[in-house]
Amino acid sequence: MKKPEKITSRTANFAKWYVDVITQADLMNYGPIKGTIYFKPLGYKIWENIVKIVNAYFVKQKIENVYFPLLIPQDFIEKEKKHIEGFAPELLTITKVGDKNLVENIYIRPTSELLFADYFKAEIAKNNILPIKLNQWSQVLRWEKTTNPFLRNTEFLWQEGHTIHASKVEADQFAKKIARFYKYFLENYLAIPVISGQKTEREKFAGAVNTYTVEAMMQNFRALQSATAHFLGQNFAKNFEIFYKNKENKSQIPFQTSWGLSTRLIGAIVMVHSDDNGLIFPPKIAPIQVDILEFFSKKNQEVKIFAKKIAKILKNAKISYKIDDTDQQIGYKINNSEVHGAPIRIEIGPNEVKNNQICLVRRDNHQKFFFNIDLLKEKCRKILEQIQADLFKKAKIRLLENTVFVNSINEFEHAVKNNKFVIAPFSESPEREQEIQEKTGATARCILPKNSFFALPQTGNSIFSGEKTNKFVLFAKSY
């Protein structure tokens, strides 16, 4: 078995560190085409855990799963030129099958609003029952100019939910509700604190009336748009001529939403929590919560028996585990466990067997605990809970300490140069946003709500025009 290679430090080269971690920790291999990856078992298990948790919420909300075609016909694209404009450079187009040119192009979905609109039209015409709440777990393809594993792939996995409602208020409120769930999920399961808010006109999803987003800070202080929910209004319903009959039997145009999160969350987990030794998983999302390392078990069968006893206790406690019973050296086993990020490792040798004792090590801070095996279930649960809380606390401190308020363009430029998240009074045009991006590299991440955990003043003077505004916008360099 090959010894784990040294991982580049975060301070030396953050981008190289990230790639080192995800490859050496066996999350993925590069695929044969730019922007594609092979999900290895550990990497895919993270996604399976995400799916399980998120799907349970969807079931409670009576959101049903479906699966729609990968291919979109040309006439759908023609109906929604404005919506597809934003995806035009990334749109994969099929023009030929075998040696025959197609009469009309076929497109590979970059997202599925067009398909859901078509489906909703048929279902409402048949049943006239609203709302309809659907979700699909699928893959989409976008020919990205710049790719980065998990964060920006040509092909990636995601969930995209779509609903259709009789009421404008109901639809918009539902989009906001999903955005709140995304915030809850990231903070409570992934231990990633986020800033939530509404996208600006320039940054909102093409075809949406409003886009609600959750933004996270990575360890290099770049923002990552982690999930979004869109209130689509009647934009798609009008173009697809979707109608329902109201209580007075009059034809009305309904309102839609769409919302999604993707495998970029795997990249977020790595970039927020991991260190120069490898992965660090929050326990609630960890594929393996406990690594059991056997030392000298080939010469001492009692070590192996003790490991199985530990495994049985963990299994009964519904704590996931893996036993390393290889004949590798102690240093290798510890290093390998560190790289792969299990929140806890338990080290077992002849001394632990002799004393009926557990040696438990936290992955995040390397703190060691020694206790009798009878306390394993209680101690393990408590320590896993503490790790989850500590990872969130550490990430939130980073977010708060590196988010600043500014009142002028000079302060803004200085803060961005120093890799800060910047909150500024801002009520300018999309052209001003573009100017800021070209000059500083920062983009508007979201308009902060009044109930943000940041103590926002009632009003401020917009940093360009000086006009009084009650709008405060978060800016940052981003992925």
Curated annotation (Swiss-Prot):
PANTHER family: BIFUNCTIONAL GLUTAMATE_PROLINE--TRNA LIGASE (PTHR43382:SF2), PROLYL-TRNA SYNTHETASE (PTHR43382). SMART domains: ProRS-C_1. Consists of three domains: the N-terminal catalytic domain, the anticodon-binding domain and the C-terminal extension. Its EC number is 6.1.1.15. Pfam families: HGTP_anticodon, ProRS-C_1, tRNA-synt_2b. Keywords: Aminoacyl-tRNA synthetase, ATP-binding, Cytoplasm, Ligase, Nucleotide-binding, Protein biosynthesis. The gene is proS. Belongs to the class-II aminoacyl-tRNA synthetase family. ProS type 3 subfamily. It is found in: Cytoplasm. One of its GO terms (molecular function) is ATP binding. GO terms for biological process: prolyl-tRNA aminoacylation. This is Proline--tRNA ligase.
